[in-house]
């Protein structure tokens, strides 16, 4: 009897606190829950130092790996009276005497951008603009620090700081590109620079893209706002660019080099199929060669060649051929060192590392086991130690490891969650970035034995803020589907969760090939930032759950490649199975389960709502592909081959099974989406109309695949939240 009033008072106090600190979408989308970072980390070659950009973006500062202490200010915006207010990036010259500083960055596509570049002489404290006229792209030091190469208006240039030389002259928008990739190469092979210096800076090689025969896609543009396009004040306009779709013509690619001494251009002869790819060109330790990667159109055969930039002759070094497809990460994570090539491969069923010499001879498999290597940091060629990240403990965890020459593998990080690293040039130290479901990013300096030297940033204030707002716990779970497949997931419950009640559930998923959303990281969650949007929805009375189905990453090649040739089939079955599992839990209202996702997650939302088992009462698809005939050639054919080769596989799509669509459906799309075109939603909307299905669409003026700018993201998330509030309660 005496305890009862105390209990009531406690509940009232907690309720008052929760009411006072209620999550707000405006706060979430304005960056209030954004983490702090240590930005622009660059190890300084030949030293035990690294550099980074100051928090205010006005300085480049060097620090000691050994002590963690600040050593010197390499550049200061105010001290040199720079004609810009902030640094947006920088590259230290190989000799350490100059900085190439980037500012006024202007995004083009996902990875590409134009910027205004300046060269800063550290000793002389002099600042000079790299080039006059329009802004440049991918400015890059030569290995001897004497020249900088860059691209301007689709042409390749070099400068020594005084004299600027134009190497190519045929570059033209929507026709010819030199030294930077076309749209599909950039998006699907994950790079934005298509040139490389040779080892001593006496030659430069590049990929030339002839996209004149690639079909054009046009996006309608309006005046809009944030930013405003005044040129479309009275009449809308168009942005037209080359976009090869599945089975259609790609750019015709060729390789060229320029001799810095005699000014001659040489055609490089590297064998590739007429419809194949050159997905990378890299510097080799030998000045008489460059390393070129080739890939056939099916993307199941990748080769590395050494090509002489002066004669154009080449020889094959390595051939990588695996069932179904070579993952894009094999190209992205491979490293050409001074004496060796490190190549990741899933040839034995899991992604592991293989060491080759510069003649292409396989020396050894670096490590083994039933786990995937997820990133490579490099090799200390003095000791033979190889440093990498792997999902060795489980599919949802990332740790940093070293594999010794004798085959012994040691773990260098100890905190469960997601760990990554920036190593010093001599591999004696590294900057460790760690986070987990419940803890924002922590940046520390460590020795190559894993010993903590200094904490650079711990995001303590953000952590305290999440506690102030009563963010709940992200609980993990597993279950087995009716097909005998074990799937893993997480869920977020309301803070005042009562197991005797029944709650509506919202499933969030991406489900795309190789992707993971069930990952013990602060980046996990439907909109990043520690999953702030998930906690907002939980605050509104929902349970939020996420499950990685078949085709996702971290569990080996068999699991990841199981969706080959039939994208959306198994993925949608697994989300339906997730809904059935959630519905079996005593605290879940099985009649009020929704699903949503963005991009591939939007595609799989539509597929799941038309899978045939009507388990979803509502769903939201953001920027969804609706038929892979509409999507780009490289991505789609990697997993599906061409429509001509796989007609039945391409029929597995939301449009084909629109009559089975079940549940209240909201589709959101940006009208300027250069990645997943609005065409996808337009065509699906027409199919829904003809099938006599009710639905709602939201269009965002001038917004690309990210759907942001001004108040846009706040508006979008409010529509998603309101849709589920209206239809699941």
Where are these regions (language model features)?
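Predominantly five- to eight-bladed beta-propeller fold
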Residues: 25, 31, 68, 104-109, ...
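Signature of short aromatic-glycine-proline-rich micro-motifs recurring in repeat-based ectodomains
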Residues: 36-41, 85-91, 180-200, 280-281, ...
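Non-catalytic accessory segments flanking enzyme active sites
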Residues: 38-42, 52-62, 72-74, 88-91, ...
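Blade-loop segments of beta-propeller domains
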Residues: 69-96, 106, 132-137, 321-324, ...
């Amino acid at each position: 009897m005496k305890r009862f009033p105390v209990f009531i008072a406690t509940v009232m106090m907690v309720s008052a606190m929760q009411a006072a600190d209620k999550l707000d979408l405006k706060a979430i989308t304005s960056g209030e829950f954004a983490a702090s970072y240590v930005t622009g980390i660059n190890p300084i070659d030949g030293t035990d130092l690294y550099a980074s950009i100051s928090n205010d973006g006005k300085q480049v500062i060097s620090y000691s790996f050994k002590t963690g202490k600040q050593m010197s200010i390499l550049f200061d915006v105010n001290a040199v009276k720079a004609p810009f207010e902030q640094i947006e990036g920088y590259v230290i010259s190989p000799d350490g005497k100059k900085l190439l500083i980037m500012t006024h960055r202007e995004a083009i596509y996902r990875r590409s951008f134009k910027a205004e570049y300046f060269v800063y002489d550290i000793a002389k404290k002099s600042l000079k603009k790299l080039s006059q006229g329009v802004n440049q792209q991918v400015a890059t030091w030569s290995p001897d620090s004497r020249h900088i190469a860059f691209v301007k208006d689709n042409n390749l240039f070099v400068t020594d700081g005084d004299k600027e030389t134009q190497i190519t002259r045929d570059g033209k928008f929507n026709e010819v590109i030199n030294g930077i990739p076309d749209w599909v190469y950039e998006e699907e092979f994950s790079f934005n620079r298509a040139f490389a210096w040779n080892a001593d800076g006496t030659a430069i090689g590049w990929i030339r893209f002839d996209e004149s025969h690639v079909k054009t896609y046009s996006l309608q543009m309006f005046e809009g706002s944030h930013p405003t396009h005044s040129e479309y004040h009275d009449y809308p306009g168009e942005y037209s660019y080359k976009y090869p779709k599945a089975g259609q013509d790609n750019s015709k690619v060729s390789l060229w080099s320029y001799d810095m001494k005699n000014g001659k251009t040489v055609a490089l002869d590297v064998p590739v199929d007429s419809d194949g790819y050159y997905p990378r060109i890299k510097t080799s330790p030998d000045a008489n060669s460059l390393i070129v990667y080739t890939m056939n159109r099916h993307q199941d055969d990748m080769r590395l060649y050494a090509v002489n930039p002066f004669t154009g002759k080449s020889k094959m070094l390595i051939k990588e051929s695996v069932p179904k497809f070579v993952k894009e990460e094999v190209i992205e994570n491979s490293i050409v060192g001074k004496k060796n090539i490190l190549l990741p491969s899933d040839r034995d069923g899991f992604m592991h590392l293989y060491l080759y010499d510069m003649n292409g001879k396989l020396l050894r498999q670096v490590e083994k086991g039933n786990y995937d290597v997820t990133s490579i940091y490099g090799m200390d060629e003095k000791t033979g130690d190889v440093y990498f990240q792997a999902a060795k403990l489980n599919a949802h965890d990332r740790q940093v490891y070293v594999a010794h020459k004798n085959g012994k593998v040691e773990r260098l990080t100890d905190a469960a969650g997601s760990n990554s690293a920036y190593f010093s040039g001599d591999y004696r130290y590294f900057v460790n970035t760690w986070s987990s479901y419940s803890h924002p990013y922590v940046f520390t300096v460590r020795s190559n034995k894993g010993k903590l030297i200094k904490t650079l940033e711990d995001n303590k204030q953000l952590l305290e803020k999440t506690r102030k707002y009563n963010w709940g716990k992200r609980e993990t779970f597993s279950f087995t589907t009716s097909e005998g497949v074990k799937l893993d997931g997480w869920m977020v419950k309301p803070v005042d969760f009562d197991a005797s009640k029944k709650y509506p559930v919202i499933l969030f998923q991406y489900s795309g090939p190789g992707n993971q959303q069930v990952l013990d990281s602060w980046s996990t969650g439907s909109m990043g930032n520690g999953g702030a949007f998930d906690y907002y929805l939980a605050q509104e009375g929902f349970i939020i759950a996420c499950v990685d189905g078949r085709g996702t990453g971290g569990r080996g090649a068999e699991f990841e490649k199981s969706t080959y040739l039939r994208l959306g089939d198994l993925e949608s079955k697994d989300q339906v199975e997730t809904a059935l599992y959630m519905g079996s839990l005593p605290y879940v209202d099985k009649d009020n389960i929704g699903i949503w996702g963005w991009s591939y997650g939007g595609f799989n939302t539509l597929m799941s709502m038309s899978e045939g088992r009507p388990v979803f009462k509502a769903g939201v698809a953001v920027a969804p592909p609706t038929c892979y005939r509409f999507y780009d050639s490289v991505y789609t054919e990697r997993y599906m081959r061409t429509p001509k080769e796989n007609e039945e596989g391409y029929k597995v799509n939301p449009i084909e099974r629109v009559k089975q669509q079940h549940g209240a459906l909201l589709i959101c799309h940006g009208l300027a989406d250069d990645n997943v075109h609005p065409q996808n939603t337009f065509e699906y909307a027409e199919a829904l109309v003809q099938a006599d299905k009710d639905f709602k669409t939201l269009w965002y003026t001038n917004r690309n695949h990210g759907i942001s700018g001004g108040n846009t993201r706040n508006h979008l998330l409010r529509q998603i939240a309101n849709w589920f509030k209206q239809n699941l309660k």
